[in-house]
């Protein structure tokens, strides 16, 4: 089936958009390479994207990263296809904030974020490189019947906790990431623990 949407109004912008970050992003946002989450400045390209192979039990990729329905977990016919939530680096909206700005600025960025989401879908449908050659997955489609929205996009923007929480103390990767803790403690992996917090109810 071909569910290719019309090119989004801002597709030309997002197709060429390179995040202005330090350390630098590895290239265009609409690509499968992205900055390594634990090693800033390094590129990570290992996930890839192949809904068909990932459905059949191939290695994990972007499709299965936030998959909520895998047809193999249900009786045949229960679902026509897998269903995934797209919460990837490629649809992280970077040009502005919506939580500490005037209403007009907020509306501008909400519109921009929707355009980015639609542009990512259109790019995946038409231009995303396929491992076996060729480009695009035209069978991809939004699911308004699942999201409960007219267009199939999310009901609300997802704002990461670090942007919206006003904490007494912020736990960071340096407190829990094995490599950082090994360096901090001077220990081997098997002897390394997360940083202890006396007032913690649980870290996980």
Could you describe each region identified by the protein language model?
Residues 1-204:
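Flavin (FAD/FMN)-binding glycine-rich loop and adjacent Rossmann-like elements that form
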């Amino acid at each position: 089936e071909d569910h290719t949407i019309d090119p989004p109004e801002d597709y030309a912008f997002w197709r060429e958009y390179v995040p202005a970050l330090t350390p630098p992003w590895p290239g265009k946002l609409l690509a499968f390479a992205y900055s390594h989450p634990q090693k800033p400045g390094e590129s990570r390209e290992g996930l890839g994207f192949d809904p068909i192979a990932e459905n059949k039990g191939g290695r994990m990729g972007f499709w299965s990263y936030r998959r909520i329905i895998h047809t193999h977990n249900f009786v045949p016919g229960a679902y026509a296809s897998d269903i995934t939530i797209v919460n990837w680096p490629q649809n992280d909206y970077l040009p502005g904030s919506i939580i500490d700005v005037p209403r007009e600025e907020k509306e501008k960025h909400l519109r921009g974020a929707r355009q980015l989401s639609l542009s990512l879908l259109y790019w995946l449908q038409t231009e995303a490189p396929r491992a076996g050659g060729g480009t695009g997955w035209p069978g991809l489609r939004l699911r308004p019947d699942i999201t409960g929205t007219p267009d199939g996009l999310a009901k609300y923007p997802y704002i990461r906790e670090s942007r919206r929480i006003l904490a007494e103390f912020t736990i960071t990767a340096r407190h829990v990431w094995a490599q950082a803790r090994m360096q901090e403690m001077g220990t081997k992996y098997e002897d390394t623990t997360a940083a202890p917090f006396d007032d913690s109810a649980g870290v996980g």
